[in-house]
Amino acid sequence: MLTDALAPRATIPQRLDRLPLTWTLWRLGLVTQAGWAVVVATDAIAARIYPFVWGPRHAFDTAAFSILLLVSTGVGIVAGEYFFAVLSDRFGRRTTLLAAAATCGLGTLPAGFVDDFWLLTLSLGIGAMGIGGVLATCTVYLAEVAPSQARGRMTQTSQAFAIFLLAVLTSLPGILLMPEHYQAYVVLMAAGPLLVLVPLVAFVLPESPRWLDVHGRHEQAEAVVSMLERDCETRAGPLPAPITGDVAPQSQATVRDLFGPEYRRRTVLLFACWLLGYSGLVYGVIGFLNLYLARVGFSARAVFISGLISGVVGGAAGLLAAARLNERVERRAVILAGALVACLGLVLVFLTGEVWHSLPALSIAAVILNAGAYLWLFNMYTYTAVAYPTRIRSVGTGWTDGFGHVGSIVSPLIVGALFTATAHVGYIGFFGYVIIPGALLPALLIARFGIKQKAAPLETVAGA
């Protein structure tokens, strides 16, 4: 058999990189990205409820809402990413996903039954820790099982599925339940990690063979890779010979390597870009766009309808188009293109609120915004995971993406202040911040100073 003949001469990464894209690998990608979707559905849930429930009830004011966002989209996620990243590199990707998913669901659930500011902050803060853990681990797992020549196609197609699922999970129940039955809405969001992700991870995902290999569990890594090879051969026929001899063995690596001579530059660059992007294009928009739309007169139903359309059409279509490019276009260029498209969408949202004020116009603007924002976000996820070697990949992703979530901590303070200060002139402070330092600047930095990743073996890129 081809697998047995090649096993003594090929490393685990080389054998993974020659696997064809069959249902064997698609299944792993779809499960990890379904995990991303069900936990992100709980992320910033306060921003979907406050404009239509807690705000009109005067449960707490806009300043307290900003603090709630600071904890539930910032502090909690940062703490979770760092904590679960360490667990992931020590105990494995699969075990960490199970623990983080349970934390997310159990933490979010009480938010459907209280409107006290402090109890909400505690509940959503704990849930956010689980979100951070899943974010830090899902991307790493997907990067480690995706073959290098098809990494872009596999990751971005799986991510397009995740965006479609996220749009349906957050918007369709919102159309049917918000604001009258918001408690049921929260319960549905919390049920996703507990009743969907936990069983999928427990019964479908094997442990990452790359993680097993670098942690000395060679027999387990061999068993997982052999199983994947057998399944792929059954579906696609004999496997091609792996490319050997071009990848140098990885040396022992620690967290200190993130700041050592080899990785310091890329770590600092990712710190800066995630910090700016999370403060603006991601959590600046997530935290305050719904509030802006409510202030200019859009109903909850209109906001959730536009969210469903933009998520299904915009986000998924953008990533599917990028997946067709596979690894033929440098990832840095795709990140920049995503930021430019998102900025165009934000300008159109502003014009919709100030001039056109119609659901069709809002939906078109939101489609363009989501297409660009998700293109930027998911390519940044993949770029970050691929930038580090396997032994520190989870910690590297967790540290850089986690530090970037400091942007989600400062975002409610900066964006919230600009939002309030420029309310009389169309909230242009909000739009100006999320467009310039929050989207364009980080994309330009990656395009100018980032490393090349196009179609390169994972170990070669990480060690470059």
Predicted regions: what is each one?
Residues M1-A464:
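Transmembrane-helix signature of 12-pass secondary carriers
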